[in-house]
Amino acid sequence: KGKDVNAMKATVISFLLMFGLLIAGCSDNENEEELPAPDVPDYSTIIVKGIQNMPKNFTFDRVEVKVTGLDWQVIETLIFPYENGQIVMTLPATFPSERLQKVDRRNGDMAGYWTGTSNDGDALVATLGDFFVFNGDTRVGRIALSNWSGKGSSAEKATLVSYQYADRPFILTGSDKSYYYSECSFNKGWNIFANINPSEGSSQKVLRTTTVPESTLFWRLAESYVYNK
């Protein structure tokens, strides 16, 4: 009888151990499933304020920016007022697919946007052009987002930033005579991308990337078309 009791105890202990391992395994799987998806940055609204390099007598009342798409054509002109020292640009949430541009120039197709190669050749894009500022009917200048003050050389890793809409995620790789692509992945919707210049005197190409040092960026008056007489 003593042997039977001991055998029964061993069986119960083994069962409990196996049950515990199963519970732990389920718990681990649940924890893995509960991990949140990485946050996708939202660039659908651009807020411009604290514009640098503006002369005291420089005034404007709005910004206009063209969106290019299919065959490099302008598919929309966006207009936003300059009010209370800032511009709030709410970008279109979507575009008709037939108005969008091919993502890259594979097979020598110059109608495509990027010189790098997309991992999804069916992706389509639309791109913001220059941010021109107006005072009434007169175009008085251009503003830009970068970490370059506009003084001296734009080399030494100056970052020049633009915005692009994508109809699906894609990743760019490759290089051409002037640019190379690294850490250049786009999400569905609006994205920020940068051209980062090499150091002065360097033989490196300009880096194109979506890994942008945003904390270093600021808006500035890049060009003024108003001349004091």
Q: PLM ranges: what are they?
A:
Residues T94-R168:
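Long, low-complexity intrinsically disordered regions in eukaryotic proteins
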Residues M54-D71:
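Short, ordered, surface-exposed loop/turn motifs in non-cytosolic proteins
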